[in-house]
Each structure stands twice: as structure tokens, then as C-alpha cells.
């Protein structure tokens, strides 16, 4: 998972996996078009009503400044926009924009811990490349090592799949991760161009209300089966078993 793997460590990770499972069973999962928090070196708790600055760099975040990556047009985010950090975590509201130094000024409207590498959802569409620079380097390295399985995160359209296909080719096995509303809207074309679909119910719930997730899941599965595309369901399955020996009755379904 390139969202949690340093490029410098990638050769070692691949080498170790190769010994355990063989090269044919290794899959590279891209970061994709998602904003994340940068490194946080110490425990930080941001209290409600605190004012904080938000930048678009991969620097160390503090209790005064939050840095987000990859780069995006930060000034395209208007005032009053809500920014969600992690799941059930910090919620910020943009109250001003510094156009000269290109940063946002936001107010904490829901307190929480600021942690490294947490997914960030902005309540307004911002443009992000479908593959990060890190993704491109990781994919090219993986191909040189003989890896032919890839998962593409935050696929939005068939065009995104065509972009990665130019790098991995059409013989590589591609899993397209459905975790946005755009992916659901473009599902027919995505299903035709990919080898498999993965429903990430966690990230999808940022854009689809939780009570509608089962309906979205059912639609994606039926659509994928109609196109004879294999489909995986992921995130929070058997969550109880992290701490308990058995799942709940609801989870067993």
C-alpha cells in the first residue's frame, strides 16, 4: 500500500514479500487522488474553536499549521468549506484565505487528534492527479521487478484507468477501487476497462451517507456481475474480531 510505504523502503518490502509469497502474488496499491495529512512528530490534540493554518506542502504538521499533500490548488477552496480529517476525527471550517502566501485559515469545529498520513476530505471538489509522483515511481520500479498486479485507488473515470494502463500495459491485472461518487457514476465504463472492482466502503462513506452504503454496495456488485467483472468488498468487515474471537450476528451476514 503506497499510502503507507516509503519509496526508500519499497525495495526491501518487495524483496521480503517475494521470499514469502512469490512475485506473482504481490500487488502494488496506489495512493491515488486523495489528500492526506503530512508527518506529525508528536501527539497533537486540536481543541474546538482553535484557529489554524492549512498549507499544501509535505512538511511537518504542528498545532499551528497543518500540511496536506499531494499538491493541489488550495486557493480554489472557498470560505465556509468544511474539511474532514480522518474518520470521525477533526472537522475544520475555512474562514479566510491568504492569497499572497497561498494558505487557508480555518477554525476547528470538531476537536480531535491530529495524526500522520490521515485521509482528508474537502467538502468541495478539488482537482488531483489520478496518480501521484510517488505512485508513478513505485509502479515503474515494481514493473522492473516483475510485478504485474496493481490496485488503483480513488478511480473516478475510465480516463483514470487509461492513464495507468499506459504505464502497466494491458496484460497486467488491475483492480479499480470504487470509493467516490464519480466512480459509481462511471461504473459501466470502469467495469469494461478493469480486471476487477474493489468497493472501499470506508472512503466511499465520505461521499455517500452511511445509510446508503448498502444500496451503493448492492448496485456496484450487480453492475460488476453483469459485466462479468470480479468484485471485492472491503473495509470494516468483521471489525469486531480485531478484539474479539467471534463476529457479531450482523457482521456474519
Regions inferred by a protein language model and the residue ranges of each:
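Non-catalytic helical/linker scaffolds that mediate oligomerization, partner binding
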Residues: 1-253
Amino acid at each position: 500500500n503506497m499510502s503507507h510505504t516509503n519509496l526508500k523502503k519499497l525495495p526491501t518490502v518487495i524483496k521480503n514479500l517475494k521470499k514469502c509469497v512469490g512475485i506473482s502474488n504481490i500487488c502494488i496499491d496506489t495512493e491515488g487522488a486523495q489528500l492526506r495529512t503530512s508527518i506529525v512528530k508528536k501527539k497533537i490534540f486540536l481543541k474546538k474553536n482553535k484557529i489554524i493554518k492549512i498549507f499544501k506542502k509535505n512538511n511537518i504538521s504542528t498545532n499551528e499549521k497543518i500540511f496536506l499533500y499531494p499538491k493541489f490548488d488550495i486557493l480554489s477552496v472557498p470560505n465556509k468549506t468544511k474539511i474532514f480529517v480522518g474518520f470521525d476525527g477533526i472537522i475544520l471550517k475555512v474562514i479566510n484565505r491568504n492569497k499572497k502566501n497561498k494558505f487557508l485559515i480555518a477554525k476547528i469545529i470538531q476537536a480531535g487528534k491530529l495524526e500522520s498520513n490521515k485521509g482528508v476530505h474537502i467538502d468541495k471538489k478539488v482537482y488531483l492527479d489520478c496518480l501521484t509522483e510517488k505512485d508513478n515511481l513505485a509502479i515503474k520500479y515494481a514493473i522492473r521487478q516483475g510485478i504485474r498486479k496493481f490496485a488503483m485507488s480513488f478511480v473516478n473515470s475510465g480516463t483514470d484507468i487509461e492513464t495507468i494502463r499506459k504505464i502497466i500495459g494491458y496484460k497486467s491485472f488491475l483492480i479499480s477501487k470504487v470509493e467516490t461518487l464519480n466512480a459509481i457514476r462511471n461504473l459501466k465504463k470502469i467495469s469494461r476497462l478493469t480486471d476487477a472492482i474493489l468497493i472501499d466502503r470506508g472512503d466511499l462513506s465520505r461521499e455517500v451517507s452511511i445509510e446508503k452504503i448498502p444500496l451503493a454496495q448492492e448496485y456496484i456488485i450487480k453492475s460488476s456481475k453483469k459485466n462479468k467483472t470480479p468484485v471485492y468488498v472491503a473495509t470494516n468487515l468483521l471489525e469486531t474480531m480485531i478484539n474479539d474471537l467471534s463476529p457479531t450476528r450482523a457482521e456474519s451476514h
